[in-house]
Amino acid sequence: MQYWIPKALAVSVLVSLSGCSVFTSDAHNERNYRAHEPVKAPASLSQPAQDPVYKMDVGQYDNNPEATNYRPPAQVLTIAKGSWVEEADKQARIYFDKNDGIEDLDVFIWDSIQAVLADNNISATQLDKTQGTLVTDWYAIVKPEESWLWGNDESVDLERFKFTIEEKEHQRTASLTAELIDFKGDKPLTDLLKQQLEVRALNQVVSEFDYRYRQLEVDMRKRQGIISLELGFDNKGNAALVTEQAYDTVFDRFSGFLERLSFTIVEINQETGLITADYAKVESSVWDSIWGDEPTELPIDEGQYQILVSKTKQGGTSLTWMDDKGETLEPGTMNGLQQALEAALIKRGIKI
């Protein structure tokens, strides 16, 4: 009845032995075996007995062993609008799509590269735009942090990079590749370090591309804010500001624009299109001049004005400015007012 016991023992031994293979070599590292300090008895008591056979030395190990670099490969940052990368691409490469407002995509990328070189106080040693290549001079892509008190004696690595632009035939997409071609430094140039440096150089250009396009978008919004205010006449022959924008669009938003120019809206007549507003000049403060937010001053006197918004025969909109008595402003005043309003639209980036 007990014949199964030896077999069961044999199986259990085999299983236990096979399970030993799952342990890594660090499982029995000496750091895992420690003995604490022996119990310290008070002076009035005797020390507990301890068998010398089982006595172990107290282990002294540093809790901060030598650091090992486990940093992952660097990533190309697709922060710029219209930028993307291909999965599993081994090169430091990014693609740019031609966004609205960019006339020549390759020129926009070249300007971004040149701006990065200027920030690093270097220039290109080789430049061939027909081949789409640029080789930089020596510079430090990674700059150590400096202390204002002690300075920094740490040696700086220097690199030279080759940037390559490849534009598709349709000129709507272009790729930019960064390649490390030379290196000076105390550290050994490993494959990981090479990849990190290349991606870092590429990301600097991507950041500059993103910054420049954001500025371009702001300029485009400012240009869109101009409603083509021109001197003209309303349907009754009075001097007025004329725009090609539709009546409903101008009438709905023009009162809000006036409030940004120190006007206080008194009345809006939806039926006649007449806006009555009080104008008071605002004194600029020191903080306004520092932050570039000085109020726009119009070439008109303080007081109440009436602005008649009307449809033109051409399908646009006319703005007839009158004083508090309902008399149309002089053509010279209208000319200065037209220039001031356009400047305000551009400065604030307002789109009516």
From Swiss-Prot:
A lipid is attached at C20 (S-diacylglycerol cysteine). This is Outer membrane protein assembly factor BamC. Keywords: Cell outer membrane, Lipoprotein, Membrane, Palmitate, Signal. GO terms for cellular component: cell outer membrane. Belongs to the BamC family. Residues 1-19 form the signal peptide. It comes from Pseudoalteromonas sp. (strain SM9913). It is found in: Cell outer membrane. It comes from the Bacteria. Part of the outer membrane protein assembly complex, which is involved in assembly and insertion of beta-barrel proteins into the outer membrane. It is a lipid-anchor.
